[in-house]
Amino acid sequence: MHGEFRKSRAMQLPRQITAGHGVLPQIAAMVRDFGLKGTGLIVWGPHTRALAGDTIAKTLSDAGYDLQTYEAGEATTETVSRAKEIAQEAKASFLIGVGGGTKIDIAKLAAHELSVPFISVPTNCAHDGIASPRATIKDDGRIRSFDADVPLGVLADTAVLIKAPWRFLAAGCADVVANKTAILDWRLAHRLRNEEFSSSAATMSEMSAEAIIQEAEFLKRNLEESAWSIVRPIIVSGVSMAIAGSSRPASGSEHLISHALDQIAPGKALHGEQCGVGSIMMMALHGGDFKRLQRCLHTVGAPTTLRQLGISKEQMVQALTTAHKVRPDRYTILGDQGIMPEAAERLLETTGVAA
């Protein structure tokens, strides 16, 4: 006779996601619908303030909300601490992150550590952190991924998103397409290490990747509908992590390679770009159709080669052979020992990434 079932887990999901043309003024209604009162802290940068921040601030001020603002730099533990200090001094009851990955991650982690709600207002789609429960923060010079909470709400204005350089939107596409290898790694860890696996989270993650792959040829620069087609899968990808209770649905060996490159060749390429190229190679290791990913990335304008990434062959070989050490607890196709330099070089040649 089987034992009594006692498994339980809480899932945090965004309460409201609003995306589309000209939705920024809906921030006041969103905050009101959430029942948020008191003072809000807006985290932005000088560029993102002009893109969307001023509209957010004016709309909330006109609606009677008291606001404090913090013009933050890069996402570091220091800027997160400063955001917390400002929020505590102002007795802020909610935070709003306006920007790309860094400003959203600063506000996200600060809100998590203060146990207050957070609203995400993206100004570009460079990666899938818009709605995820993870924050990527530089800690003592090293890039780390921190547990956080999903945003209470997401407000994504496509009229703003399409103004970002196309490189950022293409990088967001690459980050989501890389979910294909993340899921393969997760399934492998489930089979070999008995790691918990969520079919629903995996399905959402794969669905978001497929949405980009199947629409790649229709995604065009300066076409607002393209921002609409990109931001939806990016948000779904983030939500899949919330359902899984971990970043597993969207972070596998390709992300380990990206994090290794952050240390070996910092600032050379965007996170999503590195993940996209990593996914080409990892799909080949899995024995899958890596050329399908390659075609998609090429079509949307994301890098597919070392030259396009600005990474040398030696740097990528180093990343491939050391990536397994980035998160020893995260089992992937790279295994416990990693791959040999000769195998890494062969992989680069076989996939055409070395071109």
Question: Which functions belong to the PLM regions below?
Answer:
Residues 2-4, 176, 287-355:
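C-terminal charged capping/lid subdomain of soluble metabolic enzymes
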Residues 15, 112-208:
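A glycine/threonine-rich phosphate-anchoring loop and its flanking beta-alpha core
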Residues 87-125:
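A short, small-residue-rich loop immediately preceding and capping a beta-strand
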